[in-house]
Swiss-Prot record:
Pfam family membership, one: VHS
Assembly: Component of the ESCRT-0 complex composed of HSE1 and VPS27.
Protein name as it appears in the record: Class E vacuolar protein-sorting machinery protein HSE1
Gene name of the encoded protein: HSE1
Keywords linked to the UniProt accession: Endosome, Membrane, Protein transport, SH3 domain, Transport
Topological type in the membrane: Peripheral membrane protein
Family label: Belongs to the STAM family.
Record's GO cellular component terms: endosome membrane; ESCRT-0 complex; vacuolar membrane
GO MF annotations, alphabetized: phosphatidylinositol binding; protein domain specific binding; protein heterodimerization activity; ubiquitin binding
Organism: Eremothecium gossypii (strain ATCC 10895 / CBS 109.51 / FGSC 9923 / NRRL Y-1056)
Tagged with keyword Lipid metabolism: no
Annotated VHS domain residues: 14-144
Role of this protein: Component of the ESCRT-0 complex which is the sorting receptor for ubiquitinated cargo proteins at the multivesicular body (MVB).
Domain named UIM: residues: 162-181
């Protein structure tokens, strides 16, 4: 009897409605208990799961389905036979047909049935799960089939033109809105020509085209190509641009890729009233920070006092307690903003590193084209006497990048060469004299 209670307690903990995701440690704890006595454990755990599946809390049902899948994969044939039994498959189908069960729960049931059917296909005695899957496919095909990936077809010229026009119109309306805001804030209205004023008053007010900035994934997607974006159901993707007719490019957790539009839903942008309401609620939460600190300080001082008789403490507590859900919501909001900013920083850092690398390569390529030859050479003007061969020119030993050829020059007082010949001698050229006893010729 104690063993049965342990299993029921473990099942209740693993399928708690307060859990927002599967806790695999709790799930494996149930599996460990069932493995201790496979015969009785399989019976007790399935009875506890049946009871949990009949509750109205959708979250409890979702956690119970995850527990069923975990038990089927880890606890042997006894549990598998109980899961594939006519009684349990009938309970799952009852949930599929129940109108009060949410569509998300029904899709999860169909997903688990599909998974178990694939796991049980080698054992004919577990055919009940595959029969249930076929029954769901026949009567509720929308619960099993995920949308097909659309083809990557190029946008037509008209579609691209329409997109450019929508963007131009959006920018125009944004500029007008900014100018109106400047006037409303007390700034001087910008001077406009009479023709512009006439055209502005004559044009009817056009609705601002809706620009999709964020979308929310409604299905899981595992990328099959390098340029595609992988995501999980519930992820919020920032839309960058439309690449193909049915594919967009987006940003998620620092990664950029394309994704199909039929796998996501548009996140509507909040209206001005909603933004103002949210800001007011946030301000109200932060305004209560002093009361929270005051309550904490009084509780520290009154540790040995019965707080139920302290009216001030009771009043403060009743004031700050309703703030908990709002604080939790704000934590989630700013956590998402932090993640978005971290992703943006990562993308910006990668772009900056790529740009610097390309700039460095371009600089090295340009430098190599302007590097003069470092070979030792002797200067001898044509048509001159033999003594000129005694002047020898060589590049300096230091590795200095020379300037452009247009700035090359040599001091004529040092060389004594004609001006039209001095331009061909690079700057910083060393002149080494050999023994010469005669005078330089005069030009």
């Amino acid at each position: 009897m104690e063993y049965k209670q342990d299993i029921e307690t473990a099942v209740s903990r693993a399928t708690d409605g307060k859990l927002r995701t599967d806790n695999w440690q709790y799930l494996l704890d149930v599996c460990d208990l069932v493995k201790e006595e496979p015969e009785d454990g399989a019976q007790y755990v399935m009875e506890a799961i049946d009871e949990r599946l009949q509750q109205a809390d959708a979250n409890v049902i979702l956690r119970s389905l995850s527990l069923v899948a975990c038990l089927s994969e880890n606890c042997g044939s006894r549990v598998q036979q109980a899961v594939a039994s006519k009684r349990f498959t009938g309970l799952l189908y009852y949930l599929i047909e129940d109108k009060h069960v949410h569509a998300t729960v029904k899709r999860e049931i169909a997903k688990v049935v599909d998974q178990l059917s694939s796991s049980f296909q080698r054992d004919p005695s577990l055919k009940g799960m595959s029969d249930l899957l076929q029954k769901i496919i026949r009567r509720y095909p929308h619960l099993v089939a995920e949308p097909k990936l659309p083809q990557k077809r190029e946008m037509s010229a008209d579609a691209k033109l329409q997109e450019d026009q929508d963007l131009e119109e959006a920018l125009k309306l944004s500029l007008q809105e900014y100018e109106q805001q400047q006037r409303h804030n007390g700034g001087q209205p910008p001077q406009q020509a009479p023709a512009a004023l006439a055209s502005e008053t004559s044009l009817p007010e056009q609705p601002q085209p809706q620009i999709v900035r964020r979308v929310k994934a409604i299905f899981d997607l595992n990328a099959s190509e390098p340029d595609e974006l992988s995501f999980k159901k519930g992820d919020v993707i920032t839309v960058i641009e439309q690449v193909y007719k049915d594919w967009w490019r987006g940003l998620l957790r620092g990664k950029v890729g394309i994704f199909p539009v039929n796998y996501v839903g548009v996140c509507p942008e909040p209206t001005a009233e909603e933004v103002a309401k949210e800001a007011a609620q946030e301000h109200a939460v932060f305004a209560q920070a002093g009361n929270v600190e005051n309550l904490l300080q009084k509780l520290r001082v009154s540790q040995n006092v019965d707080v139920t008789h302290e009216d001030e403490i009771s009043e403060l507590y009743s004031t700050v307690t309703p703030l908990r859900p709002h604080v939790t919501k704000l934590i989630g909001k700013y956590a998402q903003k932090k993640e978005d900013l971290a992703s943006l920083r990562e993308v910006l850092a990668n772009a900056e590193a790529t740009y610097n690398m390309m700039l460095e390569k371009a600089t090295c390529y340009s430098s190599s084209n302007f590097m003069p030859s470092t070979q030792h050479r002797t200067y001898q003007p044509s048509g001159q006497a033999a003594p000129y061969s005694n002047y020898e020119f060589s590049q300096p030993s230091t590795n200095v990048l020379p300037p452009r050829p247009a700035s090359y020059s040599v001091n004529p007082q040092v060389t004594g060469l004609p001006v039209h010949q001095q331009r061909s001698v690079p700057e910083n050229t060393e002149i080494r004299y050999r023994s010469y006893s005669g005078d330089l010729p005069h030009t």
